[in-house]
Amino acid sequence: YAAAIEDANTNNTKEKTLLVNRPVENTPVEASDLAVAVHGSGTDLCILSYGNGYYLSRQAEKELAEKGIECRVVDLRWLAPLDESGIIEQAQACKKVLIVDECRKTGSISEAIMTLLYENATNSANAVQRLCAHDSFIPLGSAAYHVLPSKEDIVNIASEMCLTNTKAESKA
């Protein structure tokens, strides 16, 4: 949306099905402000996400705080082009990074973000994990919850990453 305003071009918009009919904040988008949106200032964990993954990450943020994990949730806001400098800046400010992506693990935007972080951020390789949907068709209705990331998945992986020394396994 913001890029369409900036370029004054017609663009196709994809909307996450699980976000339909969810309340949203009505904040005006300035064409000159196309940076990532950062919520929180914790340094234990940076959660990078967008769409419904962002919504679930904000829910998980509350449970993680109860476990003593201070995190920040970064809303990517748009995927092309990525705000690479904003992503790197937020990742470097934290000890660990979790990328939450509702797309399938293979070929998702999380691959580009992982590459960006490995090439440019100072976090060690085991400090960056991703949580993605299974490599399968995404079913409709309640069956979708068997293959898509959930708030519980985010809390579990984030807890493993921050409270233990073992490398968390991503879903899929």
Q: Where in the sequence are the language-model features?
A:
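Thiamine diphosphate
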Residues: 2, 11-12, 16-172
